[in-house]
């Protein structure tokens, strides 16, 4: 993430940089924290649901080896896809995820990020 960048902005930017696909952020589907992942450092992993605004893929070869569109059933049925990734896709299909919201009293908005499920705002 870039300094001052929110998660939703980073997700949209990273996908466009690495695949050439323009997207719109919809929700956060998954968050994973892995203690001591590499070099004794933690790894934080976010997965977002994004709506594609374009479909032409242009791979940034320094970052990724392969990128393609495929039917969800093929993805979930593939023996080469790790169970963690299948679990994330299943969660995205079965849950609306959590979306960015603003909460009164937390200003300026540039300093705060809140992600909540639909209908979670109280008293705004």
Model-derived features with residue positions:
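The catalytic Nudix box helix
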Residues: 1-28, 48
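Hydrophobic/anchoring residues in structured secondary elements
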Residues: 28-30, 69
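Active-site-adjacent beta-strand/loop module that shapes the phosphate/pyrophosphate-binding cleft
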Residues: 33-57, 72, 88-96
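Nudix hydrolase/Nudix homology domain
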Residues: 3, 61-124
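Extracytoplasmic/secreted proteins and extracellular or luminal domains
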Residues: 21, 40-41, 60-63
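Acidic/polar loop patches that form or flank catalytic/metal-binding clefts of enzymes
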Residues: 26, 57-59
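Generic structural "secondary-structure junction" signal
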Residues: 3, 9, 31-33, 59, ...
